[in-house]
């Protein structure tokens, strides 16, 4: 869940209640826009930190999250997605990964964006299930997902979620071992 404000007709601010879901929300929103129409995209600066706001007036919010997000937006070009926590250790481990993910998402087609979004949102991640959701055949969905490098994006989102869970828990010195996924 979250709160949002739209202003100036072409800008918005979104507050995600659980910081660990902020990157997934941003990537999902980007994919949804790219899936909606060819050539449509958005620039987003994701930041986590303290925030004070009234739910009906997100645009008047204050705190680290708003300041960091604003700074990120000021410096976002030529990128479309940035991330900042204000914690050097976390930022060192996540900003480069975010730029790679951003670069990859930039190159996705409308169909790849639609299919990748359906995969990421699906409870059942099987290609058959995603194909049923999209009313496409499984082999076509598999081909599109592979071309969109879906596993890499899913792994990036998992990594960011784990990193932000540790951040929320007060992990000020994040270690690589803490962020490595255990199979």
List PLM regions with ranges.
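DNA-contacting interfaces and partner/effector-binding or oligomerization modules
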Residues: 1-70, 74
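Flexible, glycine/charge-rich interdomain/linker segments that couple
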Residues: 53-60, 76-99
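Short, Lys/Arg-enriched anionic-surface-contact patches
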Residues: 93-111, 164-167
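Short alpha-helical "packing" element that flanks the helix-turn-helix/winged-helix DNA-binding module
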Residues: 114-119
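Flexible coil/turn residues that form the inter-helical turn or adjacent wing/linker of helix-turn-helix
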Residues: 122-123
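Short alpha-helical "recognition helix" segments of helix-turn-helix
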Residues: 126-135, 141
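DNA major-groove recognition helix of helix-turn-helix
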Residues: 145, 152
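Intrinsically disordered, low-complexity basic tails/linkers immediately adjacent to helix-turn-helix/homeobox/MYB/SANT
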Residues: 154, 158-183
């Amino acid at each position: 869940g979250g709160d949002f404000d739209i202003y100036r007709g072409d800008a918005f601010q979104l507050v995600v209640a659980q910081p660990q879901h902020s990157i997934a929300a941003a990537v999902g929103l980007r994919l949804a826009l790219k899936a909606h129409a060819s050539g449509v995209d958005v620039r987003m600066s994701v930041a986590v930190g303290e925030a004070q706001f009234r739910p009906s007036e997100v645009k008047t919010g204050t705190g680290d999250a708003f300041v960091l997000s604003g700074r990120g937006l000021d410096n976002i070009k030529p990128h479309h997605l940035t991330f900042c926590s204000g914690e050097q250790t976390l930022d060192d481990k996540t900003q480069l990964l975010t730029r790679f993910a951003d670069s990859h998402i930039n190159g996705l087609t409308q169909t790849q964006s639609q299919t990748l979004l359906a995969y990421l949102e699906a409870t059942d991640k099987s290609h058959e299930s995603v194909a049923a959701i999209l009313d496409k055949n499984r082999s076509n969905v598999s081909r599109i997902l592979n071309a969109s490098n879906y596993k890499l994006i899913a792994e990036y989102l998992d990594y960011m979620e784990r990193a932000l869970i540790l951040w929320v828990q007060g992990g000020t010195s994040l270690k690589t071992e803490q962020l490595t996924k255990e199979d």
